[in-house]
């Protein structure tokens, strides 16, 4: 019998939970979302970096549930916009966290800008908090550029407008398997797996 290690993922975002499960479960983790453990408290994301926000979430939930917690803060950084939307990615177009409105705002701000000036990256900071241990962090990223219009049916967030470098596909045009090999979250999770196994 294989013993699974429980990992609580500090998010209410079903898209993120799905990615975590697809990447961590084959590595022997029993992944549970906040909803699955009945944690409904909203955690303020007041950090100035992805890493600060991930640490805040991981430590707050770990303290409440007394279990290992993995938290992620991730987003899109666009060079031509000075790194925006950055830590404000989820609420770029307003507090309602509307993916479509966020996409429309980015496309509007980049209207008429040439492809070479639309470079961007998805960044993901992961923090793992284990009661009684120091919180550890890793960061992953994937390079690309912003499309002129949304393409694809998969994924969530900015996936329909983020074209992966060296591919002619947006993240939303990639299958889960394809995305999980190259995404910023996959990159960070691979680093986190090595850290947890050390």
From Swiss-Prot:
Gene3D superfamilies: 3.90.950.10. Its cofactor is Mg(2+). One of its GO terms (molecular function) is XTP diphosphatase activity. The active site is at residue 73. It is an enzyme of class 3 (hydrolase). Mg(2+) binds at residues 44, 73. It catalyses: XTP + H2O = XMP + diphosphate + H(+); dITP + H2O = dIMP + diphosphate + H(+); ITP + H2O = IMP + diphosphate + H(+). Signal peptide: none annotated. Binds 1 Mg(2+) ion per subunit. Its EC number is 3.6.1.66. Keywords: Hydrolase, Magnesium, Metal-binding, Nucleotide metabolism, Nucleotide-binding. One of its GO terms (biological process) is nucleotide metabolic process. One of its GO terms (cellular component) is cytosol. Substrate binds at residues 11-16, 74, 156-159, 179, 184-185. Homodimer. Belongs to the HAM1 NTPase family. Pyrophosphatase that catalyzes the hydrolysis of nucleoside triphosphates to their monophosphate derivatives, with a high preference for the non-canonical purine nucleotides XTP (xanthosine triphosphate), dITP (deoxyinosine triphosphate) and ITP. Seems to function as a house-cleaning enzyme that removes non-canonical purine nucleotides from the nucleotide pool, thus preventing their incorporation into DNA/RNA and avoiding chromosomal lesions. This is dITP/XTP pyrophosphatase. It comes from Bacillus subtilis (strain 168).
């Amino acid at each position: 019998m294989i013993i699974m290690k429980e990992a609580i993922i500090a998010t209410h975002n079903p898209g993120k939970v799905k990615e975590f499960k697809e990447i961590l479960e084959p590595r022997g983790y029993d992944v549970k979302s906040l909803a699955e453990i009945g944690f409904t408290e909203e955690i303020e994301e007041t950090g100035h970096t992805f890493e600060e926000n991930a640490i805040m979430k991981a430590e707050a939930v770990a303290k409440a549930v007394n279990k290992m917690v993995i938290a992620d803060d991730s987003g899109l950084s666009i060079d031509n916009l000075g790194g925006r939307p950055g830590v404000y990615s989820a609420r770029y177009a307003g507090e309602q966290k509307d993916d479509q409105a966020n996409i429309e705002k980015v496309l509007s701000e980049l209207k008429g800008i040439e492809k070479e000036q639309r470079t961007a990256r998805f960044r993901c900071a992961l923090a793992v908090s284990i009661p009684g241990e120091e919180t550890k962090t890793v960061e992953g990223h994937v390079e690309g550029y912003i499309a002129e219009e949304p393409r694809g049916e998969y994924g969530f967030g900015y996936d329909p407008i983020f074209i992966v470098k060296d591919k002619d596909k947006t993240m939303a045009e990639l299958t889960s398997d394809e995305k999980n090999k190259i995404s910023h979250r996959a990159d960070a999770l691979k680093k986190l797996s090595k850290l947890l196994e050390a």
